Swiss-Prot record:
Organism of origin: Mycobacteroides abscessus (strain ATCC 19977 / DSM 44196 / CCUG 20993 / CIP 104536 / JCM 13569 / NCTC 13031 / TMC 1543 / L948) (Mycobacterium abscessus)
Recorded metabolic or biological pathway in which this protein acts: Cofactor biosynthesis; riboflavin biosynthesis; 2-hydroxy-3-oxobutyl phosphate from D-ribulose 5-phosphate: step 1/1; Cofactor biosynthesis; riboflavin biosynthesis; 5-amino-6-(D-ribitylamino)uracil from GTP: step 1/4
Reaction it catalyzes: D-ribulose 5-phosphate = (2S)-2-hydroxy-3-oxobutyl phosphate + formate + H(+); GTP + 4 H2O = 2,5-diamino-6-hydroxy-4-(5-phosphoribosylamino)-pyrimidine + formate + 2 phosphate + 3 H(+)
Task of the protein: Catalyzes the conversion of D-ribulose 5-phosphate to formate and 3,4-dihydroxy-2-butanone 4-phosphate.
Protein name (Swiss-Prot/TrEMBL): Riboflavin biosynthesis protein RibBA
Amino acid sequence: MTRLDSIERAVADIAAGKAVVVVDDEDRENEGDLIFAAEKATPELVAFMVRYTSGYLCVPLAGEDCDRLGLLPQYAVNQDKHGTAYTVTVDAKNGIGTGISASDRAATMRLLADAASTADDFTKPGHVVPLRAKDGGVLRRPGHTEASVDLAKLAGLRPAAVICEIVSQKDEGAMAQTEELRVFADEHNLALVSIADLIEWRRKHEKHVQRIAEARIPTQHGEFRAVGYTSIYDDVEHVALVLGDISGPDGDGNDVLVRVHSECLTGDVFGSRRCDCGPQLDAAMEMVAKEGRGIVLYMRGHEGRGIGLMHKLQAYQLQDAGEDTVDANLKLGLPADARDYGLGAQILVDLGVKSMRLLTNNPAKRVGLDGYGLHIIERVPLPVRANSENIRYLRTKRDRMGHDLADLDDHPEADGA
């Protein structure tokens, strides 16, 4: 197992103007980024980064600073598989040459970090790539973008950083991974930390969900305890249906059967046959009830895989005209899946979950939760409830979104579906 340094050391080094190495989850990019605070950018730091990385230097910024500086997305529909939010590239308008040298890029980076800067201080396009970090940092998205901004903020600096992926010295056509990153960090006296450790550190020191109320909910599957939560970022309310003692027989919160269910008004409430959401919710409650211990976490704000109810209905119109569920979203200028599981992970932690068996047919959901310090020991499939109205939708989820759905090829489609 690769030796990692403390988050405290990384924060101190960032504050002192040094670079650090940050590695993400092996199931995600499994790469290490060189990171330093943008306001501490010097020609020497930039030159060092260019020498040992891919050279595609990016500057993660808080969302409010991106808005203030007029940094629009590079593309209206973000198709990056990890959701990295690239904005238009920039150069400082004054005081630099062509913009590509280490000195020029350092000047642009410092200007991006300056709270007094305005959109008029930059030219577009340029040689520096700003990135928009999610509010809430690694607790919302476990990526290098958010990790770098979090480290800058923890160091008492502006929420602006510089990041780039470290290239392998053994194979220059590949990126360096954990063991080689440890050697690199030691050779250059740099701290090596993981995003998982940063998440754990922040979870110990901060809280981003609030438990508001609890009440018993008798259902056809038995009596659950409904625990209501809100987020400090928005007014969206979530509810966890809890059955039994989550701490378990050993009091450790391990091996909990969990379903993280995305809100679906049309399927869960109206019984729409266009999706399988209602039957999945019912099956999850039934499986937890049979287990006698578990959680069905109902995530509001996930309607239509996160695009909202009105956009979902518009997507249905496009599907009726022949588009599939993925292309319908994309035609509306929306991502195929905009869901964020960070708050759900915090709720599960608050409920005492340490490890779980996750009820899902969607492998991406496992990755979305696994990066938050929750150990998923097993993915438990849910029964597939196919019908003539949802069969095309299910096949698209299987073929284009990687869902583990079997036995779909023998079902006929409804006329016009």
